[in-house]
Amino acid sequence: MQKSILFIVVLLILATTITAQSKDEKTIRAVLTNQTNAWNQGNLQNYMQGYWQNDSLMFIGKSGITYGWQKTLENYKKGYPDTAAMGKLKFELLAVNKLSANYYFVVGKWNLVRSIGNVGGTFTLLFRKIKNTWVIVSDHSS
């Protein structure tokens, strides 16, 4: 009898943990879906809502390291001044790995289908749960 109760308790703990992990991963995937939708509507301001709105946000790209949400937004506006330059964005997630209760590491590919020529590359994202919200705190895209 005690073994049965212990087994049930262990199963309940595991089920709770798995559910919490699945909920976090689904939320992170939803952030990326929202970013894709905003991009494809030509709305960089909404696209940036997936990022940590802080001066410590780190973005690493072909121009080097950029710190800060506002500076990252300005760089996006310079690099993608209109919807022709933005094209249509698609993410392909290769890995979504939990590092701890408050951090996830995401690896994927990005692709822009554009009338002026398609481009694409790879990315790594560090998501952090801040004030109960998952946001990108570091983005390395190439």
Predicted stretch roles:
Residues A101-W110:
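A short hydrophobic beta-strand element
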Residues T83-A84, L112-V119:
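Short, cysteine-centered beta-strand-loop-beta hairpins and adjacent loop/turn segments enriched
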Residues L44-L99:
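A solvent-exposed, acidic/Ser-Thr-rich amphipathic alpha-helical stretch
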Residues S4, I8-G50, K71:
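Short, low-complexity N-terminal intrinsically disordered segments enriched in polar/charged residues
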Residues W52, S63, A95, K109-W110, ...:
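A mature extracytoplasmic/lumenal domain signature
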Residues Y76, F91-N97, W110-L112, T122-R128:
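Hydrophobic/aromatic beta-strand elements that line small-molecule binding cavities or substrate pockets
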